[in-house]
UniProtKB/Swiss-Prot annotation:
GO MF: rRNA binding; structural constituent of ribosome
Function: One of the primary rRNA binding proteins, it binds directly to 16S rRNA where it nucleates assembly of the body of the 30S subunit. With S5 and S12 plays an important role in translational accuracy.
Matching NCBIfam families: PRK05327.1 (NF003717), rpsD_bact (TIGR01017)
Domain of life per record: Eukaryota
Biological processes annotated in GO: ribosomal small subunit biogenesis; translation
Family statement drawn from the similarity comment of this UniProt entry: Belongs to the universal ribosomal protein uS4 family.
Organism: Anthoceros punctatus (Hornwort)
Record-given protein name: Small ribosomal subunit protein uS4c
Amino acid sequence: MSRYRGPRVRIIRRLGTLPGLTNKTSKLKSSSINQSTSNKKISQYRIRLEEKQKLRFHYGITERQLLNYVRIARKAKGSTGEVLLQLLEMRSDNVIFRLGMAPTIPGARQLVNHRHILVNDCIVDIPSYRCKPQDFITIKNQPKSETMISKNIELYQKSKVPNHLTYSSLEKKGLVNQILDRESIGLKINELLVVEYYSRQA
């Protein structure tokens, strides 16, 4: 299944607020589940499916990519669900988004694809590049890159940068301090349901 490129508001009406996908909010929110099913009993499969879809659309990844991340998480030490979230959160496009350098993850992905971003002084043009603790993220030394990202920071870095990251406006540099903990996830999600959804596939 390819990456979603359709109307974003339609998705958040069904699944609720997904800050990585869009900074818009839906008046209907995820209560649409209750409205659409009225008195019908919601199947456990559907609940798991919708949690999985939240992850897919929030992080802007394909079905195959998400399945691969689940497989990697299963082989790692610790809670599969927590490791899965850590893998997704440490993607370069998500780190740029969480630093406030882009309004959404698709916006951050575009910055990476267009080679505006450096990690440890090297251009990174792969959105799935996995950042590590002590990696530092800077802007390409070109007026276009600096102007664009400075504008984004001014407009979108409203909420506090999560504890596992630091951004210096003076140096125009972001730093990955550590692997994030569960409380720092910027999404309301039950990752265990996602792991259960893939239990027969991963």
